[in-house]
């Protein structure tokens, strides 16, 4: 891995850890701060809201900054946010600190994707983005379990102190490894926002929302599925989630290679396979070994779509990629929240856990339909705004 990509991956590891580790610490946080579990759960929603709101704001604020300075500033915000999480005296301050921390998330991955794609040869750009996002998948495999164990042993604040340390290590890696002469975007606020007039950019954002909703409509409720339907113990569920995380890691690498080979066909095939695997999961969740195989393959497919979607947004907004790339991170998080809400609504309306994967299938089919429409438009000439000519 080239050193600049390694530095970006270290930062991605820290950001991914702080995003997801709170899920394993909710009982500890609720007990320590004297709030209910649902109230503590809002710390997850607050983070997602921070990503969605902060991504476009910071993309515009940093549009004229040198890329290295922008990334260093964003990781500095990440460090400060986690520091305030660690010392938060109460729930309100912790929520505010979570939102501030989330502000850097979308902008960092958005700008980082553009930087990563410019560090390598044109035929390896998707793989470069996948390498950066490897940090995010490793956060699920290693960062979240270790952070949860640390928080359970020494208190949830210890986890945020540790993540602050990861942020400092990431800042040092970025300072040393990122070149100073990174390409500066020749852009303006008007040009950045003009990408929203491009139908293909909007389609990619829509695909990202639907694909992410397909995952989280089921994965949000994976623990009760595995315990109540499959029959795994809570301890065994931890190992199943580790297996899913390994699948995510494999999927990110595979998705990068496929996107550099045949981007649109590989995306279409992956979305179709996601729908098929989720449909199969409705049956295999009753059988422990079959469920394990299905979950691992699902993990591979779930993250294999990220590199092609990220490089597509960069290409389709080639004159002003920073805002579009950053908005795509917001789209993924909007899909996370939408999927969790749809799954919860389905369960609340009487849909059983066994039937829940069909909600994910519906979202995957919708994402596939939008992708096929995008592909059909891509094959024929279309009128585009003058900014792209």
Describe every region a protein language model picked out:
Residues 34, 66, 87-93, 231, ...:
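Helix-breaking motifs and short loop linkers at transmembrane-helix boundaries and internal kinks
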Residues 53-92:
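Conserved MFS/SLC helix-loop-helix module at the cytosolic interface between two early adjacent transmembrane helices
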Residues 55-66, 251-263, 347-348:
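Helix-to-loop junctions at the C-terminal end of transmembrane segments
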Residues 77-84, 92-101, 289-297:
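Paired small-residue
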Residues 93, 121-179, 221, 225:
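Helix-loop-helix hairpin linking two adjacent transmembrane segments in secondary transporters
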Residues 97-135:
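Cytoplasmic helix-loop-helix junction between adjacent transmembrane helices
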Residues 108-120, 304-317:
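Intracellular juxtamembrane helix-capping segments at the cytosolic ends
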Residues 265-309:
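C-terminal transmembrane helical hairpin of 12-TM major facilitator-type secondary transporters
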């Amino acid at each position: 891995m080239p050193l600049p990509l390694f530095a970006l991956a270290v930062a991605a590891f820290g950001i991914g850890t702080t995003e997801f580790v709170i899920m394993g610490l909710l009982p500890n946080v609720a007990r320590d701060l004297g709030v209910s579990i649902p109230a503590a759960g809002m710390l997850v929603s607050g983070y997602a809201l921070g990503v969605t709101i902060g991504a476009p704001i910071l993309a515009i604020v940093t549009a004229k900054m040198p890329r290295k300075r922008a990334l260093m500033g964003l990781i500095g915000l990440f460090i400060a946010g986690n520091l305030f999480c660690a010392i938060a005296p109460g729930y309100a301050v912790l929520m505010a600190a979570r939102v501030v921390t989330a502000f850097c998330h979308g902008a960092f991955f958005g700008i980082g994707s553009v930087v990563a794609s410019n560090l390598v040869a044109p035929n390896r750009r998707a793989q470069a983005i996948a390498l950066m996002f490897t940090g995010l998948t490793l956060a699920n495999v290693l960062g979240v379990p270790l952070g949860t164990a640390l928080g359970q042993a020494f208190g949830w604040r210890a986890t945020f102190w540790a993540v602050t340390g990861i942020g400092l290590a990431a800042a040092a890696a970025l300072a040393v490894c990122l070149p100073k002469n990174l390409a500066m975007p020749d852009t303006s606020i008007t040009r950045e926002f003009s990408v929203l007039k491009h139908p293909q950019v909007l389609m990619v954002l829509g695909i990202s929302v639907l694909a992410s909703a397909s995952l989280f409509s089921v994965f949000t409720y994976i623990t009760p599925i595995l315990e109540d339907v499959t029959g795994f113990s809570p301890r065994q569920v931890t190992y199943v989630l580790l297996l899913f995380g390994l699948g995510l890691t494999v999927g990110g690498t595979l998705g990068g290679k496929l996107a550099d080979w045949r981007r649109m066909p590989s995306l279409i095939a992956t979305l179709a396979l996601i729908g098929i695997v989720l449909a199969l999961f409705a049956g295999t969740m009753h059988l422990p070994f079959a469920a394990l195989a299905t979950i691992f393959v699902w993990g591979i497919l779930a993250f294999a779509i990220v590199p092609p979607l990220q490089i597509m947004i960069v290409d389709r907004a080639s004159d002003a990629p920073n805002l579009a790339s950053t908005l795509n991170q917001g789209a993924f998080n909007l899909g996370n929240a939408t999927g969790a809400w749809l799954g919860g609504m389905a369960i609340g309306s009487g849909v059983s856990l066994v039937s829940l994967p069909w909600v994910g299938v519906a979202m995957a089919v919708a994402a596939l339909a939008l992708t096929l429409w995008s592909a059909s438009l891509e094959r024929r000439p279309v009128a585009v705004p003058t900014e792209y000519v």
